[in-house]
Amino acid sequence: MSRYRGPRVRISRRLGDLPGLSRKAIKRSYPPGEHGQKSRKPSEYAVRLEEKQKLRFNYGLSEKQLFKYVKAAKKLQGSTGQILLQLLEMRLDNTVFRLGMAPTIPAARQLVNHGHICINGQVVSICSYQCKPGESISVKNQEASRKLVENYLAFPGLANIPSHLELNKSNLSGKVNGVIDREWVALQLNELLVIEYYSRK
């Protein structure tokens, strides 16, 4: 299954607030479609599937990509669910978004793909790059790149920058000081249900 490129608000209405996907307010609380207002108790599978979909759409991943992250998280020591969230949060595209350099993760992905973002002074155009503590993130020293990010910084997608990151607006740079804590993950979900979903496949 490829990455979703359809209407973002439609997905938010179905799954709830997805800060990484869209900054548009959800006008209707019920799901889209002809039967959106009908209520019924979802099955356990449906609940696990919904939590998985929240993760996939918020971070803009294909099914194959998310499954690879789940497998990687299982190989590391600690809570698999929390490690999964850390792996996703420490992606370069998400880190650019959390610094406020882009209003959404898709916008951050474009910045990275088009070579506007540097790690320790070197252009990195790989969205899945895992940011590490001690690394600096900056905007390419070109007028077009700087103007783009300056405009984004004026209207960030989220109000607060996580405690593991710091931003220097004057020189359009940020620094990774650690790994994100669970409390700073902006997405509302139960990550254990995501792990259960893949364990039962």
From Swiss-Prot:
The keyword Ribosomal protein applies. It comes from the Eukaryota. Keywords: Chloroplast, Plastid, Ribonucleoprotein, Ribosomal protein, RNA-binding, rRNA-binding. GO terms for biological process: ribosomal small subunit biogenesis; translation. One of its GO terms (cellular component) is small ribosomal subunit. Residues 90-153 form the S4 RNA-binding domain. Its main location: plastid. One of the primary rRNA binding proteins, it binds directly to 16S rRNA where it nucleates assembly of the body of the 30S subunit. With S5 and S12 plays an important role in translational accuracy. This is Small ribosomal subunit protein uS4c. It comes from Pyropia yezoensis (Susabi-nori).
